[in-house]
Amino acid sequence: MAFTLEDMTEEEFEAFRGMSVQNYAKQNITSGTWTEKEALEKSEQAYENMIPNGRDSSNHYFWNITNVQGERMGWLWLYADPFHPQKEAFIYSFGLYEAFRGKGLAQLALQTLDERARELGAERLALHVFAHNETAVYLYQKMGYAMTNIRMRKQLS
């Protein structure tokens, strides 16, 4: 299936940001990093720090993954760091909507992202994935991503 990466409109970005703030809070609760009480506020602050100018934040790219029929299949958020010594770009967020999952499209989307990142001058890509998201961990490893560090936790009480 062919698809493109299209810039999000301001309205699409605002919807994406809202969804992302909620999801980041949820993932940090699931991982045990934040409590439910503090999660939403911390998530909102993290997004404010990462993209203070919203969609217009420098070197941040917010794309819809769109098929040839014009359907929005998912999203990608990439930061192309012009100052990184190894010319590394960072994938802040990537996902497919439920109807498009499980069809091999994530692999194709990541291959398309590889090309776009190269066009932006990146020589390598990095990302963060929560350990409890085993499906994503498997996908990224299958696509050639290697673990660079592992953070572990032990509950004492």
Report the location of each language-model feature.
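Conserved GNAT acetyl-CoA-binding A-motif
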Residues: 89, 110, 118-128, 151
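Extreme N-terminus of proteins, especially the signal/transit-peptide cleavage junction
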Residues: 1-3, 120, 144
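Conserved acetyl-CoA-binding loop-helix of GNAT-fold acetyltransferases
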Residues: 93-96, 102-115, 119, 138-142
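Acetyl-CoA-dependent GNAT
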Residues: 3, 7-98, 116, 147-156
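Conserved acetyl-CoA-binding loop of GNAT-fold acetyltransferases
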Residues: 122, 131, 141-150
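Conserved beta-strand-loop-alpha-helix junction that forms the acyl-donor binding cleft
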Residues: 97, 101, 127-136, 153-157
